[in-house]
């Protein structure tokens, strides 16, 4: 059975991970490629009250169900379909709905802590860290959370200063050392993306 190439893409919130992911997926036409976002795997918090959920630190590694993500990746690599969880951002807990996910030639795992967990890293054939200046990251997060997630500007800024920035410095930035390649400037760095795409195509052809 043909194996699956697993790519990990990490970096701070608003660094351009999604742009890099989209560019790589676009450049891998001819192969079956799918995104498995780490955000799908926020832990179920249905046992907590809504107010308690608001106090959860979603920028800490413990907010993610990495065990389920790892199990899903192992099953996909073994040719099995999996049910991927979905997350309800308005209620801050896991949705009841799941998404049927089929094995692919390439699976991209994208998330702020994609390189933080050693067991997860060990499943990856290529590890990428997207490195972007903090000023640009906060602006992107501000736009995303106000426009897509219904947040107020004040709440986003307060969260960034009190939670996101310290968590980035403590947990996310250090994972840069595990990357096979560091991509500055996110999706606008066409040279780095082309290099990574060529490497991934070589790996896929050998599977």
Swiss-Prot record:
A GO molecular function term, named singly, is: uridine kinase activity
Catalytic activity field:
uridine + ATP = UMP + ADP + H(+); cytidine + ATP = CMP + ADP + H(+)
Q: Where found, per UniProt?
A: Cytoplasm
GO BP annotation list: CTP salvage; UMP salvage
Task: Note the superkingdom of the native organism.
Answer: Bacteria
Give the Enzyme Commission number. Answer: 2.7.1.48
Q: List the InterPro entries hit by this protein, alphabetically.
A: P-loop_NTPase, PRK/URK, Uridine_kinase, Uridine_kinase-like
Name the top EC class.
transferase
Chief localization:
cytoplasm
Residues where ATP binds = 11-18
Q: Which GO terms describe its cellular component?
A: cytoplasm
By what name is this protein known?
A: Uridine kinase
The organism is Staphylococcus saprophyticus subsp. saprophyticus (strain ATCC 15305 / DSM 20229 / NCIMB 8711 / NCTC 7292 / S-41)
The gene from which this protein is expressed is udk
């Amino acid at each position: 059975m043909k194996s699956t190439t697993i790519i990990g893409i990490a970096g701070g919130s608003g660094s351009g991970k999604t742009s890099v992911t989209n560019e790589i997926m676009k450049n891998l036409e001819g192969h079956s490629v799918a995104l498995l976002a780490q955000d799908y795997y926020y832990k179920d918090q249905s046992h907590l009250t809504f107010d308690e959920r608001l106090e959860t630190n979603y920028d800490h590694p413990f907010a993610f169900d990495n065990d389920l993500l790892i199990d899903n990746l192992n099953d996909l690599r073994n040719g099995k379909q999996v049910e991927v969880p979905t997350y309800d951002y308005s209620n801050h807990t896991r949705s009841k709905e799941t998404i049927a996910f089929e094995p692919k030639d390439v699976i991209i795992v994208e998330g702020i802590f994609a390189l933080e967990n050693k067991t997860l890293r060990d499943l990856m054939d290529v590890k990428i860290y997207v490195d972007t200046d903090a000023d640009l990251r906060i602006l992107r997060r501000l736009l995303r959370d106000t426009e897509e997630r219904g947040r107020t500007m004040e709440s986003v800024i307060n969260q960034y200063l009190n939670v996101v920035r310290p968590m980035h410095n403590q947990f996310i930035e250090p994972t840069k050392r595990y990357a096979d390649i560091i991509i500055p400037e996110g999706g606008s760095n066409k040279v780095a993306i082309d290099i990574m795409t060529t490497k991934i195509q070589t790996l896929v052809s050998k599977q």
